[in-house]
């Protein structure tokens, strides 16, 4: 039996997104802008065969600007929350499922999208930028950890950023090499904040 591809299900995803105000499906991911400061995604993270590892991802325009300055990267994930399988017993049981027909695909996609909306309502339901950055779920690992650290700089929480960069805040995996660049740049950002009230 021929397996479906993400191209096959793109029309389904677009139709699902159209049912919910503010949502769109572009570049193989669901997205919605939060006011004019952030974007929330329900990212399927499609596999080659039609399965997904869906997750909720948050980005922020100011963090992206900071990331551009430091790393020349403009799409910095600052928070991540996996969408778990219905029968998940561990936080690592992401909602993965192979599907073979368009109807199976629609049922699966609609289900993980709906579960993603519940996560957003529970954890990211803030229109105010400061509230969102201060209350979003924290993920300290890898690239997302870097993004979280940058979000603390944007919020002028230099102490947390310093502790993360100095490895006083421990992580399971070794910290991303970009952390060294954050560490060396922190005094510059602090000085700029003291002079102008902003790090950007």
Q: What positions do the PLM features span?
A:
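Long, charged, glycine-rich C-terminal linkers/tails
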Residues: 26-30
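Amphipathic alpha-helical segments
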Residues: 3-25
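Intrinsically disordered, low-complexity regulatory regions enriched in serine/threonine/proline
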Residues: 2, 31-200
């Amino acid at each position: 039996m021929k397996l479906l591809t993400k191209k096959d299900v793109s029309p389904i995803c677009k139709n699902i997104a159209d049912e919910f105000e503010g949502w769109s499906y572009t570049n193989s991911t669901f997205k919605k802008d939060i006011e004019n400061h952030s974007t929330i995604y329900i990212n399927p993270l499609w596999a080659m065969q039609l399965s997904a590892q869906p997750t909720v991802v948050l980005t922020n325009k100011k963090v992206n600007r900071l990331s551009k300055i430091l790393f020349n990267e403009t799409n910095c994930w600052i928070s991540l929350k996996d969408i778990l399988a219905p029968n998940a017993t561990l936080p690592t049981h992401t909602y993965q499922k192979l599907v073979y027909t368009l109807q199976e695909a629609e049922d699966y996609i609609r289900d993980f999208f709906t579960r993603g909306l519940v996560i957003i309502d529970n954890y990211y339901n803030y229109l105010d930028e400061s509230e969102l950055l201060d209350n979003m779920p924290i993920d300290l690992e890898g690239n997302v950890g870097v993004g979280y650290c940058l979000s603390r700089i944007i919020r002028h929480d230099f102490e947390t950023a310093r502790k993360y960069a100095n490895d006083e805040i421990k992580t399971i995996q070794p910290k991303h090499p970009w952390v060294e660049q954050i560490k060396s740049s922190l005094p510059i950002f602090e000085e700029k904040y003291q002079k102008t009230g902003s790090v950007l």
